[in-house]
Regions:
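Conserved phosphate/pyrophosphate-binding and hydrolysis machinery centered on Walker-type P-loop NTPases
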Residues: 89, 122, 212, 363-370
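Right-hand nucleic-acid polymerase module
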Residues: 98, 199, 203, 228, ...
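Beta-rich nucleic-acid/ligand-interaction surfaces
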Residues: 119-126, 245-248, 280-282
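Helical (often loop-to-helix) elements that flank the catalytic cores of nucleotide-handling enzymes
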Residues: 251-272, 295-305
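Conserved polymerase palm-domain catalytic core
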Residues: 114, 135-241, 245-264, 280
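Conserved two-metal-ion catalytic palm core of "right-hand" nucleic acid polymerases
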Residues: 1-170, 175, 186, 377-431
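Mobile genetic element proteins and their domesticated derivatives, centered on retroelements
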Residues: 75-76, 100, 211, 215, ...
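Short Gly/Ser/Thr- and Asp/Glu-enriched loop/turn motifs at secondary-structure junctions
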Residues: 68-70, 239-242, 274-275
Length: 431
């Protein structure tokens, strides 16, 4: 049975819903998915897919089918001047493609090596961090870290299709559908003014389309041979989508492996981001996926801390303007700021939102960066409550911060450690 047939199975949708809501899932997404399932929103989309497969031109283009074109948008991150291009399908089609991706990643997970950590069932980036930490003599090894430049949108579709054909040989209908999506050259460009014919349709090379659900499966598949090559030779290596790190006992071995990565990517039509290429010595430690390894300890990477502090500063400035404009007290603004960041940093009981304490706490082994964030957060709240950045802000005492809702990351981390140790002890007693 083709995976496409499961897209019409209500029981399959319920399993998907139960899975998503069991994880760190935004509440808004859970509500939208529930409404979509209750309304059987997949039915029109499955009809579009059937029409696509029945259309004789589908193998070449989606031009005369009912499946919509993806929309293109160029977005910029607040923390940098860099822009990136993302693609999205309309909400109903996007939701169906999310289920299809979920099914794909599970059925074909056996294609991938154990050193790949992106978008895999039961595996997270934290598993990569933990495995690297357990690698024998990792603190004495030379490291190489690389980032693939614009990976998703740079994958040459003509090179991916033979790999996809081999992987999905037993499901020709699925292969036909996915090939049609990949080879469709047209997109809707929101930056192009509307013309009489609809006007936003442009033609371009778009790779595997960053932002679309299926790109996760393609990103894993396209470099699986490189992953396997390092795994078979026992070289410490990890890949999370476009982020790569590897280790060697000598600088010469490390450099040879780095050259191998560069050559492999070049053969696949890809290139490395030179600004993110790092050759490390044992005494340097290394950072990977938001974590920093140094002298046998794991902490939050400096770049992650910097990004959070920038967000805190922007929010504090915005709330300072807000309370002055509204004629409200500084304490009102301080309390509002704390509510925003408490939601980001701490998961509430029964809350499935992804938060810092769920992501970082189980992995880090020291609290230096948590302490740095605590001090910065206290300063932002004192500024809002006192209405000044002068020394007068220290008139706002620590007890005042706690009354407004402040929670210390360091304190919460130690409490979490105690809970983890107690739970582990209880489990050992039971066994």
């Amino acid at each position: 049975m083709s995976l496409l047939e499961q897209l019409s199975d209500e029981a399959c949708w319920e399993r998907f819903y139960n899975y998503k809501t069991s994880l760190s899932c935004p509440k808004t997404f859970a509500k939208e998915l529930r409404r979509f399932i209750d309304a059987r929103g997949w039915e029109p989309v499955c009809g579009e897919i059937r029409d696509c497969l029945n259309a004789p031109v589908f193998e070449k283009t989606l031009q005369r089918t009912t499946f919509p074109l993806p929309s293109k948008a160029v977005i910029s991150k607040q923390s940098s001047q860099k822009k990136r291009t993302v693609y999205t399908y309309p909400a109903p089609e996007n939701t169906v493609l999310k289920l299809l991706t979920w099914l794909l990643l599970r059925k074909y997970d056996g294609l991938f090596s154990g050193n790949l950590y992106s978008f895999r069932p039961g595996i997270t980036a934290k598993d990569a961090v933990r495995r690297l930490r357990r690698t024998k003599d990792i603190n004495r090894m030379y490291s190489y870290k690389a980032d693939i430049s614009n990976y998703f949108n740079s994958v040459p579709v003509e090179k991916l299709l033979p790999m996809l054909s081999e992987a999905l040989a037993e499901d020709p209908a699925l292969l036909n559908f996915l090939s049609g999506l990949l080879t469709e050259p047209r997109v809707l460009d929101g930056s192009v003014p509307h013309a009489p014919d609809g006007g936003r349709v442009v033609t371009e090379q778009k790779g595997i389309m960053a932002g679309t659900p299926l790109s996760a499966f393609y990103a894993n598949l396209y470099l699986k041979d490189m992953d396997r090559s390092f795994a078979e030779r026992g070289i410490p290596y990890a890949r999370y989508s476009d982020d790569i790190i590897l280790f060697a006992k000598t600088a010469e071995e490390r450099d040879a492996c780095a050259s191998e990565v560069g050559h492999f990517l070049a053969e696949r039509g890809l290139s490395l981001n030179p600004d993110k290429e790092v050759f490390g010595a044992p005494e340097d430690g290394f950072t990977f996926l938001g974590f920093e390894f140094q002298e046998g300890y794991i902490d939050i990477a400096p770049v992650s801390v910097t990004k959070l502090k920038k967000k805190m500063r922007r929010k504090a400035r915005a709330l300072d303007r807000w309370h002055r404009r509204k004629g409200l007290s500084g304490e009102k603004a301080a309390a509002a700021c704390l509510r925003v960041f408490n939601r980001k940093l701490f998961a509430a009981e029964g809350d499935n939102e992804l938060s810092w304490n769920r992501w970082f706490f189980p992995v880090i082994t020291r609290t230096d960066r948590l302490h740095e964030i605590d001090l910065y957060a206290q300063d932002c709240i004192r500024f809002l409550a006192a209405g000044t950045r002068t020394k007068a802000r220290f008139d706002v005492r620590y007890e005042d911060l706690k009354r407004l809702g402040y929670r210390s990351l360091v304190h919460e981390w130690y409490e979490n450690e105690v809970k983890e140790r107690n739970a582990q002890s209880a489990q050992e007693i039971q066994t």
